[in-house]
Amino acid sequence: MHQSGSRTLSKEELALLRLFAFKVKHNLTEAAFNDLLIAFPGNDISSWQVTSRHIQCLSGFKPVRYDCCPDSCVCYTGPYEKYDACPVCGKARYKPNSTQLRSYFAYLPIIPRLCAMVANSRLAKEMHYRSQYEDESQEGIMEDIFDGDLYKSLLNKLIMVVGKNLPFHHFSDHRDIALGVSMDGVSVFKKRSKTCSPLLLFNYNLPPDTRFHMNNIIPAGIIPGPKKPVDMDSFLHPLVQELVQLEIGVTAFDGLSKTVFLLRAHLLVVIGDIPAVTLLMRMKGHNGFSPCHMCKIVGVKASLSNTYYVPLHHRNVSGSSSGPYDPSNLPMCMHNGFIDEANQVQFARTLTLEQNLATEFGIKGIPLLSSLGSLSFPASFPYDFMHLVWENLILNLVLFWTGCFKELRHEGMGYSLDDSVWTDICCISAEASDTIPAAFGCHVPDMSTQRWQLTAESWEVWTLYIAPIMLYGRFTEEKYYKHFRRLVHLLKLCLEYELLMEKVAKIENSFIRWVEDYERSVIKVMTLNGVLTCSNAFRFYYQHNISRLLACPLTIHALLHVGSSIRANGLVWTNWAFPMERYCGDVVRHVRNRHYLYIGINNYATSSAQLAQLKLRYDLDEELSFGSQDNDAGHIYDGCK
C-alpha cells in the first residue's frame, strides 16, 4: 500500500507511475510513449497527454511558466511584468498578431518539494543531520559547511524580512533547512552556439554522503538560451519570492512526529563560476576596473585590450596609482559597504552618475538576493574551487608550458616544454590512467590530441596523481617543477574531508607564497665579494614585467581568497560545482529535438523533478527506480576486508 497522508494509490495509478518512471529513465519521446498503446494493446496504457495530467495531480506541483525574451535577456517578472518587448534587445514578447508567447522560463516551485522531503519519514530522519552535527561537532576541526563562520553567525541572528526582525533566530528549530543555490551555463552542442542555465538547490540538512545525489538535488528550473541572461534577477524573482516565504515559514507535515509545524529554510551559500556569480551579484564582472568580487584590488588594463589584470605588484605599470598590495591584508569587501555602494548606483540621480559609480564600484545595482537576510555579500559567494582550479588554473599552467598562453613570449623560458616532450607526457599519462582505479576519478584522455574530452574531473585526476610523476625532470629549470609540486600539495590539503583550523591558516599562507612566487621577478643577492647582483633563480611567470601583464588573470588572484572562503563557508567540497556539472551532463544527454530544443529541456527538467517528488510522496524510491539505486559502497573483496 502506497500513500501520501490520507491519499492512497490505486493499482491503476501505481501502474501509471511505473510507466512514467520508465519514460523518464529511458528518455522516451512523446511519440515513442504513445506508440506503447499500439505495441501493447489491452494493457490500459494512457496517452502521454493524459498521463502528464495525472502526474501533475499526483506529484502535487507543476511548473509555472513565465514569459521571457527569445534571447533570454530578461524574464517578464517584477518590473518587467507588463512589458510587451524586451527592454534590452527590443524583441517582441509575443508572436506577430497574436498573444502567443515566443519563449518561456518554466520555474519549478521548491516549497512543495521541501514539504515532501520533511513529510517522508526516511528522509526526514536523515535531515536531522544538521541539528545532530551541531551537538557533536568538535571545536577547532572543520568537517562541513556548518563549521563555517557564516553559519555560526546566523545562529544568533534574528530573521529579517523586508527590513523587519522576526521574533526568532535562524535555525532555531531543528527542522529548519539549510540551502545552497547553484547556477551555471551549459553548452548544449559542441559548437557552443546555444546555451542554457540550470538553477539548482542543495539540501544541506542531508548528510554529506547523500546530499549531492541526483535524487536529492532540487532543480528550480532551466533558464533557456540561446544566450546568457542580461538581467539575472528577473529570472530569480519566483525563487526569491519562495525563499522569503520560507524565511517566514510555511505549514508542513513532519513525517517522524506526525504533526503539523512551521517549516523554515535559509539560503547559506551561492555557488557558480565567475560569470555566474557576476550575474547573481549584479557586478561588472571579471573584466571590470575592480574585477574581484571579494576585495577591492584595482585592475590594470593591458595594452590594446579591454581586459583588466590583477597583479599584486603594480610598480612600473603605466597608469596605475596603486603600489604593491599586501596579499595578507587585501582591501576586503564587506557586506554593509557592498550594499551601500549598490544603493548609490541604484538610486543615482543621473544615468551618467550611475555609470560612473558602477565603473568605480564594479556593481551595477542592488542584487535581488540581498533581500534574503541569511546571505552576506560577498562572503556567501565563494570562488568555486572546481572552475577556479581544475578548469582554469591548471589549464593555464599547461598553456604556459606548451607556449600557448595568450600573446606572451615563451621561447627560452625555463617552464617551456618542447612539443615532443609534451606529446610524450600526454601519451604516457593516458596509458597510466588506464591502470588507475575508477574510484579515484574518470579516465584521462590524451591531452595532446583529445583535449576537448577533458573535464574538470579528468584535470583533477591528472594533476593529483599523474602530473607530479610525468613532469619530474622535464623542465629546464627545476624551480618550475617545485613550484608546481607545492601547488599539488596545497590542493590535496584543500580536498581533505576534515581540517584543523591551523591547516586553514596554512592554506591561506601557502597560497600567498605561491602567488607571490608566480609573480616574482629577479632579486638582488649579495655575493661573497660583497657585490649586489641580480639572480634569475626566483623569476617565474609574471616577473613583475608590464609586457607580461597577461600572466595575471583574475583566476590567479582568486587563489588568495580560498583560505578565507573555507573559514566562511566550510570545506571546498561542500560548495563546489561538481553536482551541477553532473546535472548539466544529464541534461545534455537528454537533448533529443533540436528544433524544439528548450521545450524539450524544460520537459525533461519537469519530468525528472516530478518523478523525484512522486518517490518521496508515496515512498516509492526503490520501486520507481526499477532496482537501480545508486550504490556508492562498491564491492569489498574478501582479501581487502
PLM region spans:
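Cys/His-rich microdomains that often coordinate metals
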Residues: 73-77, 93, 296-299, 584
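Residues immediately within or flanking Cys/His clusters that coordinate Zn2+
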Residues: 63-66, 70-72, 83, 289
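Short, cysteine/histidine-rich loop/knuckle motifs that typically chelate Zn2+
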Residues: 68-71, 88, 294
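Domain-level detector for long, ordered catalytic/regulatory cores in large eukaryotic signaling
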Residues: 82, 91-156, 236, 244-456, ...
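Terminal interaction-prone segments of large eukaryotic proteins
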Residues: 296-297, 395, 403-641
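Compact, glycine/acidic-enriched structural inserts
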Residues: 204-251, 303, 495, 619
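Acidic, metal-ligating active-site segments
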Residues: 156-157, 161, 165-166, 171-225, ...
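N-terminal alpha-helical interaction blocks
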Residues: 1-66, 75-77
